[in-house]
């Protein structure tokens, strides 16, 4: 899954900063450069710059069904996790490698909930985040549907339990 693939990439990284963007081409890749520039100009306590569909300057075009699923998931995350973020799931993120190195050995999630686990564990280690606007243009059929949305909610529920116990 996504989480497994990103973790493998993180393990092989030797640069000062590391990032990823979803491969479905919905997000403009220029967002990576913007995130990197903002992260470079911030203090070391800022562990990552993450894309946010709900940022006031974001330009987001995608179907109502995806908006509904995204809204439900965001509300679920707000209730279950104590993260001061408006959007954890947009697939554009850049991090300081030193921040990733602190949490990488503890990451367990292999699916879509990986982003949330990563952000929670970074926050627990004292890192802050910058949310950045994104340009999102839904072009292709996604693998996300009602079934995967329900699976994501269930996985996220179990992640909340796991993080509370550990």
Question: Language-model features: where?
Answer:
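Acidic metal-phosphate-binding loop of nucleotide-sugar-dependent transferases
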Residues: 25-27
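C-terminal catalytic/acceptor-binding lobe
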Residues: 126-166
């Amino acid at each position: 899954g996504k989480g497994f693939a990103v973790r493998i990439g993180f393990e092989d990284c030797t640069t000062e900063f590391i990032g990823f963007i979803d491969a479905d081409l919905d997000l403009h890749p220029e967002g990576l450069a913007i995130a990197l520039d903002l992260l470079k100009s911030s203090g070391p306590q800022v562990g990552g710059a993450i894309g946010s569909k709900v940022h006031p300057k974001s330009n987001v075009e995608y179907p109502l069904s995806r908006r509904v699923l995204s809204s439900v998931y965001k509300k679920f995350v707000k209730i279950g996790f104590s993260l001061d973020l408006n959007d954890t799931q947009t697939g554009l993120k850049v991090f300081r490698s030193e921040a990733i190195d602190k949490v990488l050995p503890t990451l367990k999630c292999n699916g879509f909930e990986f982003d949330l686990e990563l952000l929670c564990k970074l926050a627990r280690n004292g890192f802050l985040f910058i949310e950045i606007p994104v340009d999102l243009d839904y072009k292709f059929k996604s693998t996300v549907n009602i079934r995967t949305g329900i699976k994501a909610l269930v996985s996220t529920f179990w992640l909340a339990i796991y993080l509370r116990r550990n």
